[in-house]
Each structure stands twice: as structure tokens, then as C-alpha cells.
């Protein structure tokens, strides 16, 4: 699945939300999150993010890896 990382915090442009064909992107208090159970890995969200915050999970930069778990926890606690 894809993961939204720190550049989204405070930005929340929402271009990705409109692009996602399966409505897997949900708004959190400070950023958007991608539901790993709904994400179909189509990558439609990645190029439309104006702050380049979206990565395929295996390509998340080392200093942003905490967002993989943060993303999972967001949906685990819903």
C-alpha cells in the first residue's frame, strides 16, 4: 500500500482524496491517511500530491518510516 508522510502535516491539499478510485484516503486531525486494507496500489495519489508526501510503503524514506506504523494505527483505532 501507499503511505502519506510528514510533508502532508499542516498541508492537507486533498488532491489525493479526489483522485483515489476506492476512497481509501481519510482525513486525520493533522494529515491524511491511506487505509492499507482498501488501497489497491494503483498509484493515482502519488503524482497528484503537491508536497510529494506519498510513497509506496517499501520506498518510504528512512527518516519517514515511522509514518508506516502511524498510518496503520490511525485505522486500527477507528
Swiss-Prot record:
<feature type="binding site">
    <location>
        <position position="39"/>
    </location>
    <ligand>
        <name>[4Fe-4S] cluster</name>
    </ligand>
</feature>
<dbReference type="GO" id="GO:0051538">
    <property type="term" value="F:3 iron, 4 sulfur cluster binding"/>
</dbReference>
<feature type="binding site">
    <location>
        <position position="49"/>
    </location>
    <ligand>
        <name>[3Fe-4S] cluster</name>
    </ligand>
</feature>
<dbReference type="GO" id="GO:0009055">
    <property type="term" value="F:electron transfer activity"/>
</dbReference>
<keyword id="KW-0004">4Fe-4S</keyword>
<keyword id="KW-0411">Iron-sulfur</keyword>
<feature type="binding site">
    <location>
        <position position="16"/>
    </location>
    <ligand>
        <name>[3Fe-4S] cluster</name>
    </ligand>
</feature>
<keyword id="KW-0408">Iron</keyword>
<feature type="domain" description="4Fe-4S ferredoxin-type 1">
    <location>
        <begin position="2"/>
        <end position="29"/>
    </location>
</feature>
<feature type="binding site">
    <location>
        <position position="20"/>
    </location>
    <ligand>
        <name>[4Fe-4S] cluster</name>
    </ligand>
</feature>
<keyword id="KW-0479">Metal-binding</keyword>
<keyword id="KW-0677">Repeat</keyword>
<comment type="function">
    <text>Ferredoxins are iron-sulfur proteins that transfer electrons in a wide variety of metabolic reactions.</text>
</comment>
<dbReference type="InterPro" id="IPR017900">
    <property type="entry name" value="4Fe4S_Fe_S_CS"/>
</dbReference>
<feature type="domain" description="4Fe-4S ferredoxin-type 2">
    <location>
        <begin position="30"/>
        <end position="59"/>
    </location>
</feature>
<dbReference type="Pfam" id="PF00037">
    <property type="entry name" value="Fer4"/>
</dbReference>
<feature type="binding site">
    <location>
        <position position="42"/>
    </location>
    <ligand>
        <name>[4Fe-4S] cluster</name>
    </ligand>
</feature>
<feature type="binding site">
    <location>
        <position position="45"/>
    </location>
    <ligand>
        <name>[4Fe-4S] cluster</name>
    </ligand>
</feature>
<dbReference type="Pfam" id="PF12800">
    <property type="entry name" value="Fer4_4"/>
</dbReference>
<keyword id="KW-0249">Electron transport</keyword>
<feature type="binding site">
    <location>
        <position position="8"/>
    </location>
    <ligand>
        <name>[3Fe-4S] cluster</name>
    </ligand>
</feature>
<dbReference type="InterPro" id="IPR000813">
    <property type="entry name" value="7Fe_ferredoxin"/>
</dbReference>
<dbReference type="GO" id="GO:0051539">
    <property type="term" value="F:4 iron, 4 sulfur cluster binding"/>
</dbReference>
<keyword id="KW-0813">Transport</keyword>
<protein>
    <recommendedName>
        <fullName>Ferredoxin</fullName>
    </recommendedName>
</protein>
<dbReference type="GO" id="GO:0046872">
    <property type="term" value="F:metal ion binding"/>
</dbReference>
<keyword id="KW-0003">3Fe-4S</keyword>
<dbReference type="InterPro" id="IPR050294">
    <property type="entry name" value="RnfB_subfamily"/>
</dbReference>
<dbReference type="InterPro" id="IPR017896">
    <property type="entry name" value="4Fe4S_Fe-S-bd"/>
</dbReference>
